[in-house]
Structures are given as C-alpha cells and as structure tokens.
Swiss-Prot record:
<dbReference type="InterPro" id="IPR016162">
    <property type="entry name" value="Ald_DH_N"/>
</dbReference>
<feature type="active site">
    <location>
        <position position="277"/>
    </location>
</feature>
<feature type="binding site">
    <location>
        <position position="171"/>
    </location>
    <ligand>
        <name>NAD(+)</name>
    </ligand>
</feature>
<dbReference type="Pfam" id="PF00171">
    <property type="entry name" value="Aldedh"/>
</dbReference>
<comment type="function">
    <text>Dehydrogenase involved in the degradation of canavanine, the delta-oxa-analog of arginine, allowing growth on canavanine as sole nitrogen and carbon source. Probably catalyzes the NAD(+)-dependent oxidation of L-aspartate-semialdehyde to L-aspartate.</text>
</comment>
<keyword id="KW-0560">Oxidoreductase</keyword>
<dbReference type="GO" id="GO:0008911">
    <property type="term" value="F:lactaldehyde dehydrogenase (NAD+) activity"/>
</dbReference>
<dbReference type="InterPro" id="IPR016161">
    <property type="entry name" value="Ald_DH/histidinol_DH"/>
</dbReference>
<dbReference type="InterPro" id="IPR051020">
    <property type="entry name" value="ALDH-related_metabolic_enz"/>
</dbReference>
<feature type="binding site">
    <location>
        <position position="371"/>
    </location>
    <ligand>
        <name>NAD(+)</name>
    </ligand>
</feature>
<dbReference type="InterPro" id="IPR016163">
    <property type="entry name" value="Ald_DH_C"/>
</dbReference>
<feature type="active site">
    <location>
        <position position="243"/>
    </location>
</feature>
<keyword id="KW-0520">NAD</keyword>
<feature type="binding site">
    <location>
        <position position="145"/>
    </location>
    <ligand>
        <name>NAD(+)</name>
    </ligand>
</feature>
<feature type="binding site">
    <location>
        <position position="245"/>
    </location>
    <ligand>
        <name>NAD(+)</name>
    </ligand>
</feature>
<comment type="similarity">
    <text>Belongs to the aldehyde dehydrogenase family.</text>
</comment>
<protein>
    <recommendedName>
        <fullName>Aspartate-semialdehyde dehydrogenase 1</fullName>
        <ecNumber>1.2.1.-</ecNumber>
    </recommendedName>
</protein>
Length: 470
C-alpha cells in the first residue's frame, strides 16, 4: 500500500491542508492511523529491495530526470509552496531552485561515492591480502520533515537516500504535505519504483509507531528539540540523524562594512517570516557602531511589507498557523514584562506577525535562551570580542552563527571559538549551500545533512578482503 496514492483524493479520515494567509482549503490528504504501519513496513521492505537492485547509473538518471522536470514546472511548485506554507513567491521560487540543485547533487553522489581501496599491505601480517570497501544501503529509512521548507528539506532526505539505494517512508508535516507528495510523484514519473518512497500523512501517533518499528534502520528527522528527544527515547537501536533547531547569533564588529551587515542581517532575521532554524535571532553589536547599526536595521525592518505572499512586494508572509503567531506574540510579551525595549513590530493580524526588534532583553527570557522560530530579533551591545564570543555561546541550541568583520584574525578566531555547526564570515547565519555539511553542536543536531554527508549517514561500509594464496 503506497499511501501517497491516496493523498490527493478525499478519503476518510482525512486532513485538510489550509492556506496560512486566508484559511482556504488547499487540498486534503489521508490521515493515516498507526494501525496501517504494518502495511507501510511491508511496502518499505519491498522498496528497499527494489532500490538496492537499481544500478547506480539508474538511481542517478532518475534523480537527474526528476530535477529537470521540477525545473520545467518550477512555477507550479512555487505556487504550491506559497499556498500551503505561506512563503512569499520569491522565497518559494528560491526553494524550488534549491530542490533542483539538491536532486542534481544527489545524482552525482550516486555515481561518485562508492567506496575505497583498503591498503591491507600497509600492516604487517596482511601482505597477501587485497581488498576494498563499498558503501551499501541501510535498508528502510523513516524521514520526518517540517513545514517551513516543505520541498527542499524533503529533497534532502529523499535524494541521498535514493542515491544510496534505500527505501523511505516519508512523513511530511501534516500542515504542509502537498509539496512532498508532488515531489514524490515526479520521482516516480522519472522511473523510481513506486515502493521505494511511501508517503504517510498523519499525526503524532503515526510518527511514534513508525519510529518504534523494528524494520526501520534509520530515522532522519528535522523538527523541534522536544520531539527529537521523544524520538530518541522511542527509536531503540536505530541510527538517528536530527536537525533540531538553533538560536543563531551574528556578531557585528566595529570594523565591518556596516551597510552590507545591515542588509544581510535583515534578510537573515526575517526570511520566511523567521520560520527558519538558521535564521538570525540574536545580533551582537560592537559598542562603537551600536547606535548606527540599530538605526539602520530598525528602519529596514519597519519598511518590510507584511501580508499576502502572492504579491510581488510582500517581504513577510504569514506564519504557518495562528497558534504559531500567538506563540511569537507571547514570547515577546514575556520579554517586555522582563524589561526588554520594543524598537519596532509586535503587531499581529491573524497568522501574520510583523518584523519585531527588541533590545535590553533579559538573558533568562525565552526569547534569548530558546529558538523563537518567528520574525523576532534581539539586539545586544558588547564591548570586547571575548564578551561577544561568550554571548554567542550562551544558548544550548547551536546550528549556525555569523560574524561581520574586515579583520581576518578576528574572523578566524570567531570560527574557532563559536560553538556551532557552521560559522558564516561576512554573511548572516542564514546562508546555506546544499552541498556543504549542515548540522549543529550541543543540542542543535545529531549527525550532518548536506547531500554527500547525508549519503554517508544513510549508507554503511562493507569490506571485501581477498587473500591471494600462492
């Protein structure tokens, strides 16, 4: 049973996918219950055999063809992302381009990363032996994806998994599953056997049953820390790869290009309505330029247009649900009650929440310690570089960080000392290239994504050793 076949039909029970901006019904998907998991696993086992049997050139050609077809139909994909996830049209168009690139990178990985020669004769006592290791599929992988990048984050699970010869049971966010379903349909149209990727749309109980299933060899999860902890407790002896969130700092030194820093940080803070795990949340600004930076940053933030994501001039679309917008509002209210100063924003209308900038934030507040996942940014002054590093490293969640400086020694010192999975120099924390390793430190993640690195997580080495006798 491939649940993706049911997804666009009205079935009972079903989930209505709502447009975050106007509340209209974008589509319906099956609400798959936990009792269906044995059927999903049966399909997954069959798919694992089918994908492992595909030669590498065939896996690559399927991924390449799907990428070309998505590129051809980019406008339709972008519109679907806008409708179900609320991204602005320009943001959705960028996500489609990244998805195409992710699939192309995965196709290349299928052909390139096949193993290595093992130099057995480098060790005394093994001179008569020759051999190598190959990279073999794990088997069946469960991938659980969020709503904020409903197409490209799915591609980051499926592309490397298929390249490595695995099958996947994909559970996309029930808030925005339609882009995932469309992507899978394009993979099947490109020649992927239907059993290789099974899309199962449903709620938390379905997810728990999939995570606990013994036939599953790996869980690849992108989402919140609390859910990640629950998965780790439930999964048992399975491989885990998790991107759990961040609270990204960006240090702005007094010697930087101020205009470039402001422009980049505005984009990094408010892209996708702040619903971005590497979005800039804390701006740490050198005292000599604090007032100048604050004035320019606040002016740009106030100029951002909030509203209908289909309009060309919209900068910030809606948050995914009204509850998400209310949570952001509540987090800011708490900070204000603890003495923070509001510089702009903090206006909510339905699911829309305007660009919000705070200063004088208490470091015990949630907005400082936790991931906001909203268009909210904190400005914090510092006097010395050592102080900036200490401030950057305070939270438990660390994916990306950034620093703006014209001094190479300062930049490299920050790269060494900031606790994060990536340090962007003269960029906001929000920069990501889909080929680079992606993940965090502390409680930010387990393992790494990025096509090559996900491929290695989703495969395992197998040694072949030949003893040449005589």
């Amino acid at each position: 049973m491939n649940v993706s076949r049911l997804a666009l039909a009205v079935v009972e029970p079903h989930i209505e996918v709502l447009n975050p901006f106007d509340g209209s019904i974008v589509g319906t998907v099956a609400d798959v219950c936990a009792s269906e998991v044995p059927h999903l696993l049966e399909t997954g086992r069959s798919g694992a055999r089918a994908c492992a049997a595909l030669p590498r050139h065939r896996r690559a050609s399927i991924l390449e063809q799907a990428a070309l077809n998505i590129e051809r139909d980019a406008k339709a994909f972008a519109r679907l992302i806008v409708d179900e996830a609320g991204k602005t049209l320009k943001q959705a168009e960028k996500e489609v381009k990244r998805c195409v690139n992710t699939l192309k990178l995965s196709a290349e990985e299928a052909k390139r990363n096949a193993g290595e020669i093992v130099p057995f004769d480098a060790y005394e006592g093994a001179e008569s032996r020759q051999g190598w290791f190959t990279r073999e599929p794990l088997g069946l992988i469960v991938a659980i994806t969020p709503y904020n990048d409903p197409l490209n984050l799915v591609a980051h699970k499926l592309g490397p998994a298929i390249a490595g010869g695995n099958a996947v049971i994909l559970k996309p966010s029930e808030l925005a599953p339609l882009s995932a379903l469309k992507l899978v349909s394009y993979l099947v149209a490109a020649g992927l056997p239907e059993t290789v990727v099974t899309v199962a749309t449903g709620g938390a109980e379905l997810g728990k049953a999939l995570v606990a299933a013994r036939d599953v060899r790996m869980i690849s999860f992108t989402g919140g820390f609390v859910t990640g902890e629950q998965i780790a407790r439930t999964a048992g002896l399975k491989k885990l790869a998790m991107d759990l969130g961040g609270n990204a700092p960006v240090i702005v030194m007094g010697d930087c290009n101020l205009d470039a820093a402001v422009d980049s940080c505005v984009s990094g803070a408010f892209w996708a309505a702040g619903q971005n795990c590497i979005g800039t949340q804390r701006l740490l600004i050198h005292a000599p330029i604090y007032e100048a930076f604050r004035e320019r940053f606040v002016n740009q933030a106030q100029a951002l247009v909030v509203g209908n994501p289909l309009l060309a001039n919209t900068d910030i679309g809606p948050m995914i649900t009204q509850q998400a917008a209310q949570n952001a509002e509540q987090m800011v209210n708490e900070a204000l009650q603890q003495g923070a100063t509001l510089l702009c924003g903090h206006r909510r209308q339905g699911n829309c929440y305007g660009a919000t900038v705070l200063e004088n934030v208490d470091h015990s507040s949630r907005i400082w310690r936790n991931e906001a996942f909203a268009p909210v940014v904190v400005l914090q002054v510092f006097e010395t570089f050592d102080e900036a590093i200490a401030l950057a490293n305070e939270p438990e969640y660390a994916l990306h960080a950034g620093i703006f400086t014209n001094d190479l020694s300062t930049a490299m010192s920050a790269a060494r000392r900031i606790e994060a999975g990536g340090v962007m120099i003269n960029d906001s924390s929000d920069f990501r290239f889909d080929a680079m390793p992606f993940g965090g430190s502390k409680y930010g993640s387990l393992g790494r994504e990025g096509v090559r690195f996900a491929y290695e997580e989703m495969t395992q080495p197998k040694v072949v050793c030949l003893n040449v006798l005589g």
